[in-house]
């Protein structure tokens, strides 16, 4: 389980050409990774360095999950708004 969390994709810098080629995770996958990170952060034997690395990874997962949720909300709003051109 520990190794699985660190296999998540890092957010590439915005200028990286490979950003579009990186596999995308679903909202549920991001939430699952975040839940795993929270479980690990509760481990009293976790070192400070590992805890900080895990926290950074968890924050990335949270950010990406929030973006997916925001995009879904915007898409829902778009579908609910009648097209004025029609």
Swiss-Prot record:
One of its GO terms (biological process) is DNA catabolic process. Coiled coil: none annotated. GO terms for cellular component: cytoplasm; exodeoxyribonuclease VII complex. It is found in: Cytoplasm. It comes from the Bacteria. The keyword Cytoplasm applies. Keywords: Cytoplasm, Exonuclease, Hydrolase, Nuclease. Pfam families: Exonuc_VII_S. Residues 1-27 are annotated as: Disordered. Its EC number is 3.1.11.6. The keyword Nuclease applies. GO terms for molecular function: exodeoxyribonuclease VII activity. It catalyses: Exonucleolytic cleavage in either 5'- to 3'- or 3'- to 5'-direction to yield nucleoside 5'-phosphates. Heterooligomer composed of large and small subunits. Belongs to the XseB family. Bidirectionally degrades single-stranded DNA into large acid-insoluble oligonucleotides, which are then degraded further into small acid-soluble oligonucleotides. This is Exodeoxyribonuclease 7 small subunit. It comes from Helicobacter pylori (strain G27).
């Amino acid at each position: 389980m520990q190794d699985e969390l660190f296999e998540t994709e890092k957010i590439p810098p915005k200028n990286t050409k490979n950003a579009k080629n990186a596999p995308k995770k679903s909202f549920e996958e991001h939430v699952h990774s975040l839940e795993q990170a929270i479980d690990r952060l509760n481990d009293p034997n976790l070192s400070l360095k590992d805890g900080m690395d895990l926290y950074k990874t968890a924050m990335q997962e949270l950010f990406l999950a929030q973006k997916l949720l925001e995009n879904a909300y915007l898409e829902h709003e778009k579908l609910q708004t009648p097209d004025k051109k029609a």
